[in-house]
Amino acid sequence: MSPPTVPPTGVDGVSAYLMKKRHTHKKQRRKPTFLTHRNIVGCRIQHGWKEGNEPVEQWKGTVLEQVSVKPTLYIIKYDGKDSVYGLELHRDKRVLALEILPERVPSPRIDSRLADSLVGKAVGHVFEGEHGKKDEWKGMVLARAPIMDTWFYITYEKDPVLYMYTLLDDYKDGDLRIIPDSNYYFPAAEQEPGEVLDSLVGKQVEHAKDDGSKRTGIFIHQVVAKPSVYFIKFDDDIHIYVYGLVKTP
């Protein structure tokens, strides 16, 4: 898991509240196809990744979503990476030789009632660190992930980015517990009776970092189970950030 990061303290006129948790007969195999601009949601992909002067890495993963308010942006879960990435796969020059793989995404049966019962809940999630030491990270289960049926979107207080884990086994094994007060660090949005809150999805956002520089981004998703919570994609970062937003006077 990535180490905790220091999150922004505010987003464009609203206060931000944090949330955060691996010599025989051979069958002829279909070769990967080089990608054209087709619908790739649900596809398994692979490509090279070249960051600055670093060596090229090979990444392989599943395309989960195409962002409706920014269609060039895709949400991807890469194998071996816990956090979810947002990339403009056809435009980002760091993405090299993008290919579709002939693999299918497995669809195992799960306990849908139990899975749905976890969504929107504040949780304590136990991870095992070095030397077998266990550490509980408090966070919130945001949604069941698309495409990959046994996975969940989740975020943590210690690191307010979007993660994906298969949580049902952890819950059954006692490594995931539900915290009764789901508003303890994600306050509910203040709302007058009958008031309909405007969605921020598609709106641009700007915030000042600690060093005085500014970063810009876009609200890409509103969490159905917690409408005061949004996913934000900043232009200078491939991670998806998660914030609970409340109106300020």
From Swiss-Prot:
GO terms for biological process: gamete generation; negative regulation of cell population proliferation; positive regulation of canonical Wnt signaling pathway. InterPro entries: SPIN/Ssty, SPIN/Ssty_sf. One of its GO terms (molecular function) is histone H3K4me3 reader activity. The keyword Cytoplasm applies. Residues 201-246 are annotated as: Tudor-like domain 3. One of its GO terms (cellular component) is cytoplasm. The record marks D159, D170 as: Histone H3K4me3 and H3R8me2a binding. Residues 80-85, 128, 237-239 are annotated as: Histone H3K4me3 and H3R8me2a binding. Residues 119-168 are annotated as: Tudor-like domain 2. Residues 41-90 are annotated as: Tudor-like domain 1. It is found in: Cytoplasm; Nucleus. Keywords: Cytoplasm, Nucleus. The keyword Cytoplasm applies. Belongs to the SPIN/STSY family. Interacts with C11orf84/SPINDOC. Associates with chromatin. Binds to acetylated and methylated histones, including H3K4me3 and H4K20me3, probably acting as a histone reader that recognizes chromatin marks to mediate downstream cellular effects. Promotes canonical WNT signaling, and is involved in the down-regulation of cell proliferation. This is Spindlin-4. The lineage of its organism: Eukaryota, Metazoa, Chordata, Craniata, Vertebrata.
